[in-house]
Every structure is written in C-alpha cells, then in structure tokens.
UniProtKB/Swiss-Prot annotation:
InterPro entries: Ptrans_KptA/Tpt1 (IPR002745), RNA_2'-PTrans_C (IPR042081), RNA_2'-PTrans_KptA (IPR022928), RNA_2'-PTrans_N (IPR042080). The keyword Transmembrane helix does not apply. GO terms for molecular function: NAD+ poly-ADP-ribosyltransferase activity; tRNA 2'-phosphotransferase activity. It holds the Pfam family PTS_2-RNA. Keywords: NAD, Transferase. This is Probable RNA 2'-phosphotransferase. It comes from the Bacteria. Its EC number is 2.7.1.-. It is an enzyme of class 2 (transferase). Belongs to the KptA/TPT1 family. Removes the 2'-phosphate from RNA via an intermediate in which the phosphate is ADP-ribosylated by NAD followed by a presumed transesterification to release the RNA and generate ADP-ribose 1''-2''-cyclic phosphate (APPR>P). May function as an ADP-ribosylase.
Length: 182
C-alpha cells in the first residue's frame, strides 16, 4: 500500500469519524463508533474506494494510533479529537504525570496567555507526555512553541484529566496559571 493512499485515507477517516460523518451519510454512536460496512458504503457513495483491508492498513501504519476497531471488528472510531456534538466518549479519569506538553504556533500565544488552553471546536485540549510529540504538533500550525503544563498541580486543584487509547492526554481546558513556555 503506497504512503499517499494511506495518508489520504487517514485524512478522510479523521474528517468523517471526528467531525462530519453526515458528509457521507454515516451515523456515529455516543462513543464515536461507526459501523464499518456503513462507512465503506458511505465512502463509495462519495467516490472513494475503501475496504476492510485498507482500513486495517491505515490503522497499522498510523504512528499516532488515531483510530481503533471495536473488539468484534465490526465498528471503527477515532480515539479522540472529535468536534461532533453527538460524540461524548466516556474516558475514565486518570492521574497525569507531573508535566505535560502542548505544541502550538507562536501566533496563538497572546490568546493562550489571556485565556489558557481551550478546546476550540473539539471536546478536549490535547496534551502529550513527550516534548517531541508536542513540538511536532506545533509545527503543523506555524513556528512552533512548546508549552509546559503543570499537570500535577492542575490535577491537585481538581481539574480532570483523561488518557485516550493512543496515549494522548485530554483536559477540558488548561487555565493560564498552569502554563509556561518550555
């Protein structure tokens, strides 16, 4: 399977499984799961060739583990990053490491200094336990800036953290007082 096909399919899956399932007539349940046969049929109506083998190849090749199959292999979902109102994955609360990281672009710093980290159109702020991962995310948006989040103190102050299946840390928001430039 060539890299371009895998990347294009991953982008398509991100779009329909996180943000706009209705674009292909797909329905997500409250945990974000979609029936694989319905996804394949919706993709075909959209002019996209998609089958179980390609879905499996995308899941295996995606280093960020953005997607997961259900235990019975009949459903698929994005593990985090949803903006769709119908999806509210019930992540278990988790105790974070002392420090987490967030990568962003320099142009967003003024807003972050004023409002903290907010989820925007998504349901959660995404954080990483790894500096390199956070910097990589920041590079997607321009000149990267690495922010350090005092997750231990934030957690002790009563803020909830969750960890998605792929290791991404999630928070509802991160107040300014817990953020510093790394």
């Amino acid at each position: 399977m060539d890299r371009k096909t895998l990347d294009d399919t991953s982008r398509f899956l991100s779009h329909v499984l996180r943000h706009q399932p209705e674009a292909i007539g797909l329905t997500l349940d409250g945990e974000g799961w979609a029936d694989i046969d319905a996804l394949i049929a919706g993709a075909a109506r959209d002019g996209r060739a998609l089958d179980r083998a390609l879905l499996g190849a995308v899941l295996r090749s995606n280093d960020k583990q953005r997607f997961a199959f259900s235990a019975d292999g009949q459903r698929i979902r994005a593990v985090q990053g949803h903006s769709h109102a119908a999806v509210a994955i019930a992540y278990a609360p988790a105790v974070p490491p002392a420090v987490l990281y967030h990568g962003t672009a320099r142009r967003f710093l003024d807003s972050i200094r004023e409002h903290g980290l907010v989820p925007g159109s998504r349901h959660h702020v995404h954080l990483s336990a790894r500096r390199a991962t956070a910097l990589e995310v920041g590079r997607r948006y321009g000149s990267p800036v690495l922010l350090e989040v005092d997750a231990r103190d934030m957690h002790l102050a009563g803020h909830l953290f969750h960890q998605a299946e792929n290791g991404v840390w999630l928070a509802g928001q991160v107040p300014v007082r817990f953020i510093r430039e790394a």
